[in-house]
Curated annotation (Swiss-Prot):
Taxonomic source organism: Arabidopsis thaliana (Mouse-ear cress)
GO CC aspect terms: clathrin-coated pit; clathrin-coated vesicle; Golgi apparatus
Protein name: Putative clathrin assembly protein At1g68110
Domain ENTH: 26-158
Compartments reported by the entry: Membrane, Clathrin-coated pit; Golgi apparatus; Cytoplasmic vesicle, Clathrin-coated vesicle
Gene3D superfamilies (UniProt xref): 1.25.40.90, ANTH domain
SS bond partners: none
Top-level division of the source organism's lineage: Eukaryota
Length: 379
């Protein structure tokens, strides 16, 4: 960024901070300190990320869900009035961190992002220089838009399930399969977020890719964990869907390796080492395929049995009733296939990656507001 552009960008940020300072009124949706932290965390500077103010925003959000109104108001105003890809991308990264706060009262309210960047276009440079950044912002927005909706739906679904005393196992399996398919769609979206132009090797892009690499590991881990849990519970009616999900998971594992290799070549720090991804055993896949074949063969067997049953049917006439005696024939299907010890492998793999804190998204730190109580007892 040229010197005069940096100066103009700094002036814009300063004006925004002054505007917040002049309107220092704390109402139900205004918090001047939080708004100032949001402006600083989404500044026009593409050479660095203000980690301290980003984490300050997260602390405000986790300390009280009431601050969500201020966040929505401030960040939507910020994004709707900007034509800078830098501000737009930093705003997306900031909201990504908010979604990772894991505060149900906050995440549950984010059914959609408070702004629309689906057709974003930078207005400060010519299109030949900014088209790659525009694509990056749009694809990142598309992922977060669906991710926020997914997380919100999960929160509300869990609340609904907790209100029910009993739930059918078949219904829970179907819900879990639908959840896995949504996670797979989200992972596909992440794999589309990457630099596509030659002039995009900038600090801010590298920071965003660091976040996305860790998020891809997180989502893929949730997919694998959910698949391993649902395999022993799935019946013959869900076998075809399960096989489709398993094949998709295997394919995404290969795509994720390619994504890591690209990120490593681009210089993303969290992709310096390509992990050994957990694969679903061939025995599991063969068991599902066998179950599907059994279901497909069953109609033929039933037709043959009907013909044999007609021959084996004996009608005994009695004075006031007819009694039908049918030969007993039972077919046993083995649904409960054993799964290998999957939990330990994945937890070790996931823990190794989560030891590297996300550059802008560090959520697993408890936040407390400490108040010093006056000593009113000492004489």
């Amino acid at each position: 960024m040229k010197l005069w552009k940096r100066a103009a960008a700094a002036i814009k940020d300063r004006k925004s901070l002054l505007a917040v300072g002049f309107s220092r009124r704390n109402s139900s949706y205004r918090n001047a300190d939080l708004e100032a932290a949001i402006i600083k965390a989404t500044s026009h500077d593409d050479s660095s990320v203000d980690y301290s103010n980003a984490h300050r925003v997260y602390k405000w959000i986790r300390s009280s869900p009431l601050n969500l109104k201020t966040l929505v108001y401030a960040i939507s105003s910020r994004v709707n009035h900007t034509r800078s890809w830098i501000v737009a991308l930093k705003s997306l990264m900031l909201l990504h961190g908010v979604l990772c706060c894991k505060v149900p009262s906050v995440v549950g309210e984010f059914r959609r992002l408070p702004f629309d960047l689906s057709d974003f276009s930078d207005g400060h440079s010519c299109l030949s220089k900014t088209w790659g950044f525009n694509v990056f912002v749009r694809t990142y927005f598309a992922f977060l838009h669906h991710y926020s909706s997914f997380l919100s739906d999960q929160i509300h679904r869990l609340r609904g399930n907790n209100r029910r005393s009993l739930e059918k196992t078949s219904d829970s399996v179907i819900q879990e399969l639908e959840r896995i398919q949504k996670l797979q769609s989200l992972l596909d979206m992440i794999l589309q977020i990457r630099p596509v132009a030659d002039n995009m090797k900038k600090t801010l892009i590298l920071e965003a890719m660091d976040c996305l690499v860790i998020e891809s590991i997180n989502i893929y881990g949730r997919i694998c964990g959910a698949v391993m849990k649902v395999l022993p519970l799935a019946g013959k009616s869900e076998a075809a869907t399960v096989l489709k999900i398993v094949n998709k998971t295997t394919s995404q594992g290969e795509d994720l390796i390619v994504y890591f290799e690209f990120c490593k070549g681009f210089g993303v720090s969290n992709a310096r080492e390509i992990p050994q991804f957990v694969r679903i055993p061939e025995e599991e896949v063969e068991a599902i395929e066998k179950m599907i074949d059994t279901v497909q063969e069953k109609p033929k067997l039933e037709k043959d049995e009907e013909k044999e049953d007609e021959k084996a049917m004996v009608v005994l006439e009695q004075p006031k009733k007819l009694q039908t005696i049918i030969t007993d024939k039972w077919e046993i299907f083995e649904d409960d296939y054993r799964c290998f010890d999957r939990k330990d492998k994945w937890e070790i793999f996931e823990d190794e990656y989560h030891q590297n804190h996300l550059p802008l998204i560090t959520m697993n730190q408890p936040v407390y507001i400490t108040y010093t109580m006056p000593d009113l007892i000492t004489f």
